[in-house]
Amino acid sequence: MVKAFGLSKPNLLHTQPHNNMKSKILLALSLLFMPLISSAQQAVDLGQVALSKWRIGTGNYSGIASLGNNRYAVVSDKEITDGFFTFLIDQNATTGAIESVYLESFKGNSSPKVSAATGISVRDCEGIAYFPPAGTVFIAGEGDQKILEYNMNGQPTGRELTVPKIFGLGNIVPNYGFESLAYCPTTHRFWTTTESTLLKDGNAAGPMHPGEQNLLRLQSFRDDLLPIAQYAYRMDRGKADDFGKIYVYGVSEIATLPDGRLLVMEREADISNGYLSSQCTCKIFMVNPQESWMIDSSTDLQKLDPNKFMTKRLIATFTTHMTPFKQNFANYEGMCLGRQLNDGRQTLLLISDSQGGYGKGPVHLKDYIRVLILPDF
């Protein structure tokens, strides 16, 4: 029957080399195009725009959270009172570009605790998250290592997240405590971590310990404000030499994706003695708690199996500079989801902290807002 149609059983001795050659060609092509495939999975960076474009004065912006309908709550770490600003941020529905930014108002605690030495809030507000179930916001303070709830008029409600003792003020490297806060409405989880390694977990990356890798604990909380899960997170290795007069390296923010995955921003800023060779590099990684190994406060991170740290996927990296020819230095501390575009793509907003326009002479920092368009994970 086969021969009747002019066909016969293939000779495997003759076809095998052909199949091998075909496999080799496919392998070569896959290796050739792998970098292109990888880059296609990176976020699209639309760059940064100075808030001064919309006549917004310099600030100390350290966290941002979406309130819905193009409104955002923004915290500052150097205000007289703890609380938050409200911004209107409009993005182009097709491109994601920022079209306008308007600073509405500041909502502050009417009875703040103020430092006698500095005249500003002792809370050192660093991270903020909107909590839809109660219509409130939670603010993480690095000065007290607490995460307190505020109503939309900026007044404390008296409630707070039950932070595990391991994150207490006495257990952090000074000024390297809670820097981040996020909430996922889908999974009903709050998320935070310290900026750098806890004292019990090892050395913090920096001039005293060059080339160190920070080992962090990502902590989540339920809607009832109780802690629910903890995960081990290993940062990329920090700078090993040639430090400037100020060096800061740690996780400056966390954002949540609708499906519960997290975006973690690793920020490395190096300020030179003369300022004009300073730079700040930010890397944004995606991690998935649902595919990660849970730990608890008793876990020894230095002895933990490397495979039990969260698996990171880099989605964006960028560096800003302060040089005689390029003065776009930006210390990004806030990050949250922006608007969803008409084609379904999701944007990410980042806001920088200029330290109130810090600088001297003609050189001063600016506050920037930056837009990334996330890849289709």
Show which residues each predicted segment covers.
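Sequence/structural signature of beta-propeller domains
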Residues: 41-377
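Bacterial Sec-dependent N-terminal signal peptides
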Residues: 1-42
